[in-house]
Amino acid sequence: MQVRIVATTPFTDQKPGTSGLRKRVSAFRQAHYLENFVQAIFDTVTVPENATLVLGGDGRFYNREAVQIILKMAAANGFGRVLVGKGGILSTPAASCVIRKHRTHGGIILSASHNPGGPDGDFGIKYNTANGGPAPEKITDAIYAASKNIAQYRIAEAGDVALDTLGDSQLGDMVVSVIDPVADYAELMESLFDFGAIRALLNSGFRIKFDAMHAVTGPYAREIFINRLAAPSTHHPDVGANSFALTCDGRMNSPLHPADSVMNAEPLPDFGGGHPDPNLTYAHELVEILYGDNAPDFGAASDGDGDRNMILGKHFFVTPSDSLAILAANAHLVPGYQKGLAGIARSMPTSMAADRVAKALGIPCYETPTGWKFFGNLMDAGKVTLCGEESFGTGSDHVREKDGLWAVLFWLNILAVRKQSVETVVREHWARFGRNVYSRHDYEGIPTEAANGVMQLLKGSFASLQGAQFGHLQVKLCDDFSYTDPVDGSVSNGQGIRILFVDGSRIVFRLSGTGTEGATLRIYLESFEPDTSKHHLDAQEALTTLTSIALRISELRQRTGRDKPTVIT
């Protein structure tokens, strides 16, 4: 094998965000751009001789090309073996599962998660460590530092690897193992949940609809829901984990036909022109079905790379914050969690509903910055079992990523045992613990300067806001959230502005770290309602006062010209 050493110069914009490096496809297709970042990873992470790497992505545009480049670079940088998903496909939680099961040195995941795909869309890359989780900040900071000083990269001169055939092939001295991307993950799910009970539920007339949003979870959903759980399908039941392969343009060479229980199951490089973000705005097709006539009993969706989830009942939406709390309160009903929970962790903007469950269970609840990487240390140290973010991410210590299908199966297991509707489960939870009324307002694509101006204004107002009275609400504390990791003592500053009120209400302002164009300003609103007679109120109606305060103190409309959010969750 001939190794080519290519001279290069640094790019200045390769600082990883919350979930790796995300840019427009056009940026990644620049000469040397992807190669520079991959070499920065390999230069930062000490690679033992003959180490094994996991590689795969969500199937978006440029995925296959990137996989081939990384395979050749891995061979040139001394890896002994790469486990790559068939067709270059691996959902993010499945990649974490494979890293952990096969005890590899780590993995490279190609995804921009919920961001749009296609030639004019987004692309992303991140490195996961040997525990299966996203690289912590000390590693991503080192990768960024390496990217700013890179002078050359190493790449093998070799032909492309056949990604659509399972089995081993040789790339120089390195073995490339094309693996079934679904099998290990599906087996893990079957070890955690009572598939027999869920199968009985689905055979009882209980109807589900899962929207894969033309993203990576389609093959996983078909294998688990159709093949293993016998959910109704209009498609041949044998099509599942071992039968799909992507052609050069990323389309399935054995098309998946519309199914009763799984919709939009065919992964497409542009996600069918949609925005693979499972929320009430972008998953509108599913929402219309669940809120329509003759609606199914249960609905769910996942995102581009399979790590997020949205849960719906018949004419009913479950907020991600409530979902985390409800899973924790009902974990004893699920085989994989019957021995109890060590603790719960939530991101700071996520509602405090989980805190109330943790208190009732007598276990700790940790508040971390946004980003799944902050949960990794807590899970590795055995401090927490369940974790969640308000941004439709829920998971546990079974892997080190949030996991969309895992959350869906957890809900189905609970419903199978309790034999109640989604709405009844949620309302009984509120009756027991009280309702944390919660909403997130996203202002997407704001000019970065204007968004930064809003945040600077708020930071400069801390002194005047302290103790301020807004009608019946009085400010108790305002700060820029800082987190000290209880495991390794590392400190993360500047994680979001909190306005805390005496009665427990909160307003949080945060700039998102996952977009690629402009800035996304998120406003999180939360109040606690113990009165069951008010639990029926619409969240936006109940949060009107907090919304007005947020807009007033941030001068958001004046500074951005936006008169309403892009997305309300």
Model regions and ranges:
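N-terminal small/polar loop signature for handling phosphorylated ligands or for N-terminal nucleophile
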Residues: Q39, T52-G121, E223-I311
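Phosphate-binding and adjacent anionic-ligand microenvironments
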Residues: P296-F298, S302-G304, I311-K314, P335-S527, ...
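Short glycine-rich or small-residue beta-strand-to-loop segments that form or flank ligand, phosphate
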Residues: R24, A51-D58, K126-N128, R207-F210, ...
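Glycine-rich phosphate/diphosphate-binding loops that line cofactor/substrate pockets in enzymes
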Residues: V38-L53, F195-N203
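Gly/Ser/Thr-enriched, mixed-charge loops and adjacent short helices
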Residues: Q2-F11, H32, P119-G240, C248-G292
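Positively charged, low-complexity intrinsically disordered leader regions
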Residues: M1-V38
